[in-house]
């Protein structure tokens, strides 16, 4: 989809309070999209909403937010079902939530590895699983944010690389399975980016 095609479209943006997610949200707001921001921290969601409202193309735009930890499958399923009823079925789902904690492989605890996988990989799986049944009827777009570190291993980020490599594989398989519903799947693989995460 071209940016201009997002006018009056409904976009669910996960992890849109900083970095790449917020940059995408700003462009969508300026293009006239109705945006549902989803992230864990209410204060950051409020700040992002305030910024996006100043960029909105028209005063009929809906720019709202809800707190959500996408690593929680049940909470994600419940909230997404509620949002579909109150905000509408998304034309696009954009997954930008992620975490990266640099650490040598021998120092990465099971808990850190598990947490990284739950946010970076399972989080995307959880949002897709919750929304796909609703998106199948009208088609749409799913964007998962991986990384160049999902293509090339990076020193000191073994858990992050594992999650991002897996996300690319998941997204490519997803693309082949949902194309019959006219749902497109894109994977972003940005290099080092000047964001709070890096």
Model-derived features with residue positions:
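Substrate-binding pocket helix/loop in short-chain dehydrogenase/reductase
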Residues: 104-105, 109-115
């Amino acid at each position: 989809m071209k940016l201009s095609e997002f006018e009056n479209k409904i976009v669910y943006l996960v992890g849109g309070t900083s970095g790449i997610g917020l940059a995408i949200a700003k462009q969508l707001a300026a293009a006239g999209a109705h945006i549902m921001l989803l992230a864990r921290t209410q204060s950051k969601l409020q700040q992002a909403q305030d910024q996006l409202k100043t960029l909105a193309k028209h005063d009929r735009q809906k720019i709202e937010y809800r707190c959500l930890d996408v690593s929680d499958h049940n909470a994600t399923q419940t909230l997404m079902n509620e949002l579909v009823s109150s905000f509408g079925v998304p034309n696009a789902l954009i997954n930008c939530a992620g975490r990266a904690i640099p650490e040598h492989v021998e120092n990465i605890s099971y808990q850190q590895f598990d947490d990284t996988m739950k946010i970076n990989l399972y989080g995307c799986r959880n949002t897709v699983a919750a929304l796909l049944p609703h998106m199948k009827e009208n088609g749409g777009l799913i964007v998962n944010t991986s990384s160049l570190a999902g293509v090339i291993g990076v020193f000191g980020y073994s858990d992050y690389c594992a999650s991002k490599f897996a996300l690319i594989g998941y997204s490519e398989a997803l693309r082949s399975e949902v194309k019959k519903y006219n749902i497109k799947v894109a994977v972003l693989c940005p290099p080092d980016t000047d964001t709070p995460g890096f």
